[in-house]
Amino acid sequence: YEIADRDWSSDVCSSDLVMELKNKASILNNVLAGKINLGIIPTVSSFILPTEIFEFLSSNPKIELNVKEMTTENIIKGLKSGELDAGIIATPYSDAEEFFADFLFNEELMVYSADKIANEKDDQFIMPEDIDVNKVWLLEEGNCLRTQFENICHLRENSLKPKNLDFMASNINTLVHMVDKIGGLTVLPELAVSQLSDGQKEKIHRFKKPYPSREIGLIYYKPTYKQKILDELVASIKNSLKPKLNYTTHPEDFVNISPQ
């Protein structure tokens, strides 16, 4: 490997170059090693970080993964500035069309409700029109999951909260807690359901077919010497989640909801 026209005046530059050379050497020797800076949207990170991500790192001890919870917009900014090597977001996303994208998984969107949701046939499946849109707890503006729920149902301000309270949650756990303590309902991605207690799982309602779902993908600015690491990460997450998700069994029964 030939090095030319490098500025060695900076210790930081030298350190970065040494790390880059070590990473390339490891890949050439077929050893998965190196450092990846990864941004993940909060509605995904909580559910794959302690499972799929940890499992991947356990199998690849020479990989250093720096993970940050970030909004989609900040992930895009981080990729453009070089702060991030890759990001995990809800796809497709129009502002991210300039990036390469690898599919990770599709997961169903479900309703979490403190009360039984009435429907004409009194079965376990609900229609968007069955939802009392005045009792919905939402994530803060700019969150893709919020937008997806708004795209399923026409939502208005939650009438359960005090008139002098301006509240928008930043994470799914807060929404679950608000439903449990105050009432109302919210939307949960399928992976969040696995972390609920048995009692809480009884509050889960599925929509009628076609079931709404969201697509999650990994985006990156351009292929680099770190590409093999990203490819292995994508494969690891896909293989781990594929047998766990409803979409896998009958994909024809689902419709993807836009994150914008």
List the predicted regions and their residue ranges.
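Single conserved hydrophobic/aromatic residue that forms the stacking wall/gate
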Residues: 1-12
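Alpha-helical linker/hinge and terminal dimerization helices associated
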Residues: 10-29, 233, 237, 244
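Central regulatory/effector-binding core of bacterial HTH transcription factors
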Residues: 29-94, 169
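A late-sequence structural motif
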Residues: 48, 203-246
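Hydrophobic hinge/microswitch elements
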Residues: 71-76, 80-83, 90, 142-204, ...
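Beta-alpha-beta core module
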Residues: 96-102, 107, 124, 173-223
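Flexible hinge/capping segments at coil-to-helix
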Residues: 99-137
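Secondary-structure junction motif
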Residues: 119-121, 134-157, 226-230, 234, ...
